[in-house]
C-alpha cells in the first residue's frame, strides 16, 4: 500500500506567491526584471574578472565563483516561478521537484562556503599584509574553491536521496513558490525523523559554523585595527570589508531568521517573503554592492570599456 501511495504522486502543485489575479502581470514583469538584472549583473562581474588581469587575485577568484553561484541560485527557482505565473499551471513533476531541491541546496550551501573563504581572505589581507601572497597561494585558493564544490555537492545529494526514499500520499500541494525541503517533509506520509536529524546536524555544519567562522575573522580584524587605531586604517578596513559584510548580513540574516530562529506564530506568508529575499533579492543586489563600493571593479569596467572604444576606433 505504501509503495502505491508513493507512485501515485507523479507531480506536486506549487501554490506560488500569495498575490491577487489582477496583480499577476505586474508581479510577472517585476520578477522578470529582477531575474534579468541578476543574470546581467553577475555575468558582468564574471566577465570583468576574467578579462582584467588586475583582478586575478584570491579575492576575485572567490567573488567570480560567488557570482556564478548567485546566478545559478536564482535560475533554480525564478524561471519556474515565471513559467507558472504565465501559464497558470502550478504543477511540477516529482523528479523535477527533487532536482530543483538538489540544486537549490547546492548553490545555497556554496554561497555560505564562499563567504567564509572571502572573510578569511580579508582577515589575512588586513592582519598579515606582508605574508598575504605566501598564505593565499594559488594552490590554496583553488583547493578551497574545489573543496567547497565537493562538500556542497555531497551535502545536497545526501538530502535529495533521503527525500527520495520518503512516501508521499494524497496531499501534493506545496505552499511555496519552489520545492522547499521543509515543505516537502510536511507532505510525507512516512517517517521523517532521519531527515529531520540530518537537517539539524548538517544545518549546524553548513550554516552555523561558517557564520561563526566569519564572525571570528571579523573579530580578529577589529582587534587588529584597534591595536593601532588610525582614521586611515579604519577607512582601509571599511573599504576592504564593507562589501563583504553587506552580503553576509543580507544572506545570513534572512537564512538564520527563517530556518534557525522560527517564531511561534510563523506563517506561510512570512516564510515566503523571507525566502524571496535570499533567493531573489540578495543575488540581484550582490553585483551592485560589489561594483558600486569597489574601486577595483570600477577601474576594471573603465579599462574594459576604454579597450573596446580603442579597438572599434582603429
Swiss-Prot record:
Stated role: Odorant receptor.
GO molecular function, one term: olfactory receptor activity
Cytoplasmic side of membrane: 50-57, 121-139, 220-236, 293-314
Family: Belongs to the G-protein coupled receptor 1 family.
Extracellular side: 1-25, 80-100, 159-195, 260-272
Protein name: Olfactory receptor 1E1
Transmembrane segments: 26-49, 58-79, 101-120, 140-158, 196-219, 237-259, 273-292
Residues linked to a glycan: 5
Record keywords: Cell membrane, Disulfide bond, G-protein coupled receptor, Glycoprotein, Membrane, Olfaction, Receptor, Sensory transduction, Transducer, Transmembrane, Transmembrane helix
Disulfide bonds: 97-189
Record's bilayer topology term: Multi-pass membrane protein
BP terms from Gene Ontology: signal transduction
Subcellular localization: Cell membrane
One cellular-component annotation, GO: plasma membrane
PROSITE patterns (UniProt xref): G_PROTEIN_RECEP_F1_1, G_PROTEIN_RECEP_F1_2
